[in-house]
Amino acid sequence: MIYGTGIDITDLKRVQRVVERQPRFLTKVLTPNERVDYQKLSGQRALEFIAGRWSAKESYSKAMGTGIGATVTFQDIEIRDNDAGRPVVRRQPFGGIAHVSISHTETVVMTQVILERGNESW
């Protein structure tokens, strides 16, 4: 059963400006494991990565119905790629399954998270 769904669209230039002006942004948004993944990237791909993770975590918080804040923080959610390169929510406060999709164009990133409960044995 679907518990919640969240969608976010983020402008890449906006994220680039934030990263350039606020170096702590990376530490705030990315978990230590995600920062290791980020440091392997450069240029446009690095920007897409940080924007994608930020947007996906925003989508997750919307699916929870809380937004990012006291109930759910960026550090509560960890998204890593599986062996095939698909993003997977590895750590999260929701007790069910979290599905994530991240898509990019040259200028924006769009993410969707669906939280599912009751089919954990699938």
From Swiss-Prot:
Its EC number(s): 2.7.8.7
Compartment annotation: Cytoplasm
Keywords: Cytoplasm, Fatty acid biosynthesis, Fatty acid metabolism, Lipid biosynthesis, Lipid metabolism, Magnesium, Metal-binding, Transferase
Cellular component annotations (GO), alphabetically ordered: cytoplasm
Major subcellular location class: cytoplasm
Gene Ontology biological process terms, A to Z: fatty acid biosynthetic process
SUPFAM superfamilies named in the record: 4'-phosphopantetheinyl transferase
InterPro entries referenced in this protein's UniProt entry, alphabetically: 4-PPantetheinyl_Trfase_dom, 4-PPantetheinyl_Trfase_dom_sf, ACPS, Ppantetheine-prot_Trfase_dom
Cofactor: Mg(2+)
Gene Ontology terms, MF aspect: holo-[acyl-carrier-protein] synthase activity; magnesium ion binding
Keyword Cytoplasm: yes
Residues annotated to bind Mg(2+): 8, 58
Swiss-Prot/TrEMBL catalytic activity: apo-[ACP] + CoA = holo-[ACP] + adenosine 3',5'-bisphosphate + H(+)
HAMAP family the record matches: AcpS (MF_00101)
UniProt function note: Transfers the 4'-phosphopantetheine moiety from coenzyme A to a Ser of acyl-carrier-protein.
Family: Belongs to the P-Pant transferase superfamily. AcpS family.
The protein, known as: Holo-[acyl-carrier-protein] synthase
Lineage: Bacteria, Bacillati, Bacillota, Bacilli, Lactobacillales
